[in-house]
Curated annotation (Swiss-Prot):
<dbReference type="InterPro" id="IPR003712">
    <property type="entry name" value="Cyanate_lyase_C"/>
</dbReference>
<protein>
    <recommendedName>
        <fullName>Cyanate hydratase</fullName>
        <ecNumber>4.2.1.104</ecNumber>
    </recommendedName>
</protein>
<dbReference type="GO" id="GO:0003677">
    <property type="term" value="F:DNA binding"/>
</dbReference>
<dbReference type="GO" id="GO:0008824">
    <property type="term" value="F:cyanate hydratase activity"/>
</dbReference>
<comment type="function">
    <text>Catalyzes the reaction of cyanate with bicarbonate to produce ammonia and carbon dioxide.</text>
</comment>
<feature type="active site">
    <location>
        <position position="116"/>
    </location>
</feature>
<dbReference type="InterPro" id="IPR036581">
    <property type="entry name" value="Cyanate_lyase_C_sf"/>
</dbReference>
<dbReference type="Pfam" id="PF02560">
    <property type="entry name" value="Cyanate_lyase"/>
</dbReference>
<dbReference type="GO" id="GO:0009440">
    <property type="term" value="P:cyanate catabolic process"/>
</dbReference>
<keyword id="KW-0456">Lyase</keyword>
<dbReference type="GO" id="GO:0009651">
    <property type="term" value="P:response to salt stress"/>
</dbReference>
<dbReference type="InterPro" id="IPR010982">
    <property type="entry name" value="Lambda_DNA-bd_dom_sf"/>
</dbReference>
<comment type="similarity">
    <text>Belongs to the cyanase family.</text>
</comment>
<dbReference type="GO" id="GO:0042802">
    <property type="term" value="F:identical protein binding"/>
</dbReference>
<dbReference type="InterPro" id="IPR008076">
    <property type="entry name" value="Cyanase"/>
</dbReference>
<feature type="active site">
    <location>
        <position position="93"/>
    </location>
</feature>
<feature type="active site">
    <location>
        <position position="90"/>
    </location>
</feature>
Length: 162
């Protein structure tokens, strides 16, 4: 399966490369976030059939077989060696370094819970800092999910005495 996924990703990346467009440009044309476009092209997200026409318009060379493949649920996986890529390593390092503080603020602002990575939006933007130098802005926008008290009376899967 992994060889097939790699082949599909390589073909999708070739379509993008041949278009001459960036993920941000494709995102602008499709109404998606730039990270979601990249996720689609790396088979880490499923293409919604309603979005397929705008993606096809943004990438006219996208063949029908790849478009159909993109609408199937993907195998969301990654190469464990990916962490060795410096940009990915630094992103992981930033999350790990700031993670406890972010968790503390989430708990203070929302209560005991987490940020969903399912009902989730992510984007990467380029801005100028106060010093005039380029800065990277990574936005994680996830639904808040509170932890629940596990009362047996609310557990519908548990058999009830009649």
């Amino acid at each position: 399966m992994e060889d097939n996924k790699t082949t599909i990703i390589n073909r999708l990346e070739a379509v993008k490369r041949n278009s001459g467009k960036s993920c941000s440009q494709i995102a602008e044309q499709t109404g998606l976030t730039n990270v979601y476009v990249a996720q689609l092209l790396r088979r880490q997200a499923q293409l919604n059939p309603d979005t397929a026409p705008s993606l096809r318009a943004a990438l006219p060379e996208l063949p029908e077989d790849l478009l159909q493949e993109m609408m199937r649920p993907p195998m969301r996986s990654y190469d464990p060696n990916l962490i060795q890529e410096p940009c990915v390593y630094r992103l992981n390092e930033a999350v790990m370094h700031f993670g406890e503080s972010i968790k503390e603020i989430i708990n203070e602002e929302f209560g005991d819970g987490i940020m969903s990575a399912i009902d989730f939006y992510c984007s990467v933007d380029k801005v100028k800092g106060v010093d005039g130098k380029d800065r990277v802005v990574v936005t994680f926008d996830g639904k808040y999910l509170p932890y629940t008290e596990q009362k047996s009376e609310h557990m519908v899967s548990r058999p009830r005495p009649h």
